[in-house]
Design a protein with these regions (language model features):
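Short glycine-biased active-site loop of nucleotidyltransferases that positions the nucleotide triphosphate
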Residues: 78, 211-216, 260-267, 384, ...
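Short catalytic/ligand-binding loop motif for oxyanion handling, primarily in non-cytosolic enzymes
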Residues: 110-111, 169-171, 209-212, 257-260, ...
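Substrate-binding/active-site clefts of carbohydrate-active enzymes
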Residues: 145-155, 164-348
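Carbohydrate-interacting/catalytic domains
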Residues: 1-157, 182-193, 197, 461-464, ...
Length: 641
């Protein structure tokens, strides 16, 4: 038998080969971003850039840019089968050059698209991609990354500061918008977070997006940190700097939908490429955006690899997945006749469910200690359950039910709170059904919802006193914590992405005092295992009195695994002083007052009171022992025992 000579060309490591096509076509090419997009390489001794783009229904594709005077006839790309991945090597292209793909559609049109896998983008309003090299970023956070692998998020303190970079703080008088760069922000936010006591920062709007008013939720560059604040190297510097100061970094991540901007993903090759073809699935009616087609392996792979990209390449510690409910339900935001049932006749998006299970299994399986956080607003079961047990596999879920009941209760005149007492206790009926984060996010301080301070009833100082007791109740309630920027010092105005926070308010005593209060709550939280170790275990929480309806007072205890340094919270939600409020306790041991809202540094009266309380053998609240405490109106007392 005569063997035929092989004519197969050897594939270089940077080139798209058969295995890449196979894995991408199966939806399992977890590092596809290392092949797709634009990468500086050396070919036959020449330095240049290798381009690769997926455009399955394109007739022809060429790459255009500053390196070829945007001439679509110069650098034609070769189609690779079976998936329709177009590639070419351009020796004239170099780091820093702008580029796009010119795609000839089956309709005979030419459309100009940014690179879906670009690692850097032109500053808006420009829409081109920019060649860069992120293969050798400077990292010195190995201590943090090693410790992260041993993290059990359920049993660790997680207090998140939700931040929109462009409006947290700005430089006055700059010719541009005054944005802090990634490097400037790293130093400023680190100093503030360490002083306040947060454990993590969650950043909105990091992935490239053209419209500031979308807050970063209409993404066109999924693999590119926005150029508003600097380069990819600058972004990596920021993450590294935060890690070296023991601060975790969480990013908002948007796999639910994408905008219709002409340079973006919509109708990428002249046909619905990344989105569902039928508008009853592919169009989001509320947001005017396109919905990703999770049924296509290449699309789910694009998103899954993107999650891994941020976590593995940029060392990000968690992703807050936006609008999960809109992905799970086919009829989300749609009227009858506007949606297509699944094959079983139901309203569940089976492909999105499979995507989440795959996503969370892979991200968390490859990266121990990383958090996948679901913003999910319905009662979908097992969001944080294991995929092996038919759960979605998220680490944590935003507790939207708690947030709604809590804010509605706090808006009420104290006289009427007794009629809504259950709104503050109901959350404990389901507190252990998921692994929850208690959130007071950006969504609660926009669109005429008012700032947290202005949600509070009353006038002047009463609003601040209400906010103090609200924050204390939140910090004591089981669940991780998240607060949006500005609310920690009682911002008056609603948030706007167009301006920085009203830091000038800190010149006024009431705003300093509420900031002091939240800071001390954060430090209390971080140093007491009782407040986080058993968040997901009923053994970590007990009501002392949840039925003091007519006085609107709540008392409860928090416990740690070892049973040491337990905490007792007593919270008064009316302005009525209770000079001898008797609280039942489970043990006859000393109770040490560790936090008292009536101190002058928090805006209280400064009235002296004992620091240690010895219970008497007097039944109260169903307990054998009790002690009396002078509880002021809107007062909070936290005791250690």
């Amino acid at each position: 038998m005569v063997k035929k000579n092989s004519t197969k060309t050897k594939v270089q490591p940077y080139e798209i080969g058969e295995l890449d096509h196979y894995l991408f076509g199966q939806g399992n090419h977890y590092e596809i971003y290392k092949k797709m997009g634009a990468h500086e390489v050396t070919k036959n001794g020449k330095r240049g850039v290798y381009f690769a783009v997926w455009a399955p229904h394109a007739v022809n594709v060429s790459v255009i840019g500053e390196f070829n005077d945007w001439d679509e006839t110069k650098d034609k790309m070769k189609r690779g089968e079976p998936l329709g991945i177009y590639t070419c090597f351009v020796p004239e292209a170099k780091k820093g050059d702008l580029y796009k793909f010119c795609i000839e559609t089956q309709a005979g049109e030419k459309i100009y698209k940014a690179d879906p896998f670009a690692n850097y983008a032109e500053l808006r309003p420009g829409t081109a991609s920019r060649i860069t090299d992120i293969s050798n970023l400077n990292w010195s956070d190995s201590k943090w990354m090693t410790a992260r692998e041993k993290w059990d998020n359920k049993e660790e303190p997680v207090s998140i500061y939700e931040v929109h970079m462009g409006s947290w703080m700005r430089h006055p008088g700059r010719e541009d918008e005054g944005f802090y760069t990634y490097r400037e922000f790293a130093e400023a936010i680190t100093k503030y977070i360490k002083e306040m006591g947060y454990t993590h920062v969650e950043l909105m709007g990091i992935a490239e997006h053209p419209f500031d008013g979308s807050w970063g939720y209409q993404v066109t560059g999924y693999y590119a940190p926005t150029s508003r604040y600097g380069t990819p190297e600058d972004f990596a510097y920021m993450v590294n700097y935060l890690h070296k100061n023991n601060i975790g970094v969480i990013l908002d991540w948007v796999p639910a939908h994408f905008p219709k901007d002409a340079h973006g993903l919509a109708d990428f090759d002249g046909t619905p490429t990344f989105e569902y073809p039928d508008p009853r699935k592919g169009e989001h009616p509320d947001w005017g955006t396109k919905v990703f087609n999770y049924e296509k392996p290449e699309v789910s792979n694009f998103l899954l690899a993107n999650a891994l990209f941020w976590v593995e390449h940029y060392h990000v510690d968690g992703l807050r997945v936006d609008a999960v409910a809109s992905m799970l339900y086919l009829d989300y935001g749609r009227e009858d006749g506007q949606w297509i049932p699944n094959k079983f006749g139901g309203n569940e998006n089976l492909e999105a469910i499979a995507f989440f299970k795959h996503l969370n299994s892979v991200v968390c399986g490859r990266n121990k200690g990383v958090m996948m956080i679901a913003e999910e607003s319905t009662a979908w079961p097992k969001v944080t359950g294991s995929p092996e047990d038919d759960g979605l596999g998220f680490t944590l879920k935003w507790n939207m039910g708690w947030m709604h009941d809590f804010t509605e209760y706090m808006k009420l005149d104290p006289y009427f709170r007794k009629n809504a007492h259950h709104m503050m206790t109901f959350s404990m009926e389901y507190a252990y059904s998921e692994n929850y984060i208690l959130v007071l996010s950006h969504d609660e301080v926009v669109h005429l919802k008012c700032s947290m301070l202005n949600k509070m009833p009353g006038e002047g100082w009463d609003k601040f006193r209400n906010l103090k007791v609200a924050y204390a109740f939140m910090m004591g309630h089981p669940g991780k914590k998240l607060l949006f920027m500005g609310q920690e010092f009682a911002q008056l105005r609603e948030w706007s992405e167009e301006r920085e926070l009203d830091w000038f308010l800190l010149a006024e005593e009431p705003h300093q005092q509420i900031q002091n209060w939240y800071k001390d709550l954060l430090h209390l939280y971080k140093k007491n295992k009782a407040l986080y170790e058993l968040d997901n275990d009923p053994k970590g929480f007990d009501w002392i009195n949840k039925d003091d309806i007519f006085r609107s007072i709540f008392s409860f205890t928090r416990h740690s695994n070892d049973g040491k340094k337990n905490l007792l919270f007593v919270c008064n939600f009316t302005p009525v002083d209770r000079p001898d409020y008797r609280v039942g306790v489970p043990r006859r041991k000393q109770f040490k007052l560790v936090l008292n809202s009536d101190e002058t540094k928090y805006g209280g009266s400064g009235e002296e009171r004992p620091l240690v309380y010895k219970p008497e053998k007097q039944e109260c609240d169903g307990q054998k022992y009790s002690f009396a405490y002078p509880l002021p109106g809107y007062g909070v007392a936290v005791f250690e025992y």
